[in-house]
């Protein structure tokens, strides 16, 4: 129904933004990183939107890119995943990392997202692995393999999000055969060098 909004960014919070389009302010719920990425207050912005209609509410979900919107709409097609959980998933990991985890069948990484258990992660992979186009693989994707999932677990236990941890792991050079402690130190260096 409303596929995008183009207007002035009037206000924003952690996971929402108000976009003024010709005098009407539309509150859009967004992944946690999106309000800061779309622009500064008072600037003209454009967001791609999904209107979710419920019996008691109309909720507008906004995204900085069409790819994010597409992934969101694909996620909420999975049984048991509503728009709030879909948004939480895109808040925990960027779209590329999330698509990569689904394509590679990495249920362990998916289950680190708050609200996604092992069963839900398995259902997501089962239902979406073939639906998500291979165009996601053309970009720079973050692959977390079983060989370095222990680093992922350590970094998330230290308070980093699954997306941040996956980026740190992806930045590592050849780490095969390296002791776990060394691999963790190298991953932590990623955050020190940011």
From Swiss-Prot:
Q: Where is this region: Flexible linker?
A: 144-149
Matching Gene3D superfamilies, A to Z?
5' to 3' exonuclease, C-terminal subdomain (1.10.150.20), DNA helicase RuvA subunit, C-terminal domain (1.10.8.10), Nucleic acid-binding proteins (2.40.50.140)
Q: Kindly give the CDD domains that the UniProt entry links to this protein.
A: UBA_RuvA_C
Q: Does the keyword Metal-binding apply?
A: no
According to the UniProt entry, its GO molecular function terms are: ATP binding; four-way junction DNA binding; four-way junction helicase activity
Family, according to the entry, reads as follows:
Belongs to the RuvA family.
Which protein is depicted? Holliday junction branch migration complex subunit RuvA
Task: Say which species the protein is native to.
Answer: Dehalococcoides mccartyi (strain ATCC BAA-2266 / KCTC 15142 / 195) (Dehalococcoides ethenogenes (strain 195))
Q: What is the lineage of its organism?
A: Bacteria, Bacillati, Chloroflexota, Dehalococcoidia, Dehalococcoidales
């Amino acid at each position: 129904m409303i596929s995008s909004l183009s207007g002035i960014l009037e206000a924003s919070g952690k996971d929402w933004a108000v976009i003024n389009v010709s005098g009407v302010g539309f509150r859009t719920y967004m992944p946690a990183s999106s309000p800061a990425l779309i622009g500064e207050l008072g600037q003209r912005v454009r967001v791609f939107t999904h209107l979710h209609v419920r019996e008691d509410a109309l909720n507008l979900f906004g995204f900085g890119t069409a790819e994010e919107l597409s992934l969101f709409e694909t996620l909420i097609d999975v049984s048991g995943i509503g728009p709030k959980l879909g948004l939480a998933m895109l808040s925990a990991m960027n779209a590329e990392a999330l698509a990569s985890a689904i394509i590679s069948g990495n249920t362990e990484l998916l289950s680190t997202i708050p609200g996604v258990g092992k069963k839900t992660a398995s259902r997501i992979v089962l239902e979406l692995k073939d639906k998500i186009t291979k165009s996601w693989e053309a970009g720079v994707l973050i692959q977390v393999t079983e060989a370095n999932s222990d680093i992922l677990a350590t970094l998330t236990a230290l308070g980093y999000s699954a997306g941040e941890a996956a980026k740190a792991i992806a930045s590592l050079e050849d780490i095969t055969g390296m002791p776990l402690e060394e691999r963790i130190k190298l991953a932590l260096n990623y955050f020190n060098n940011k």
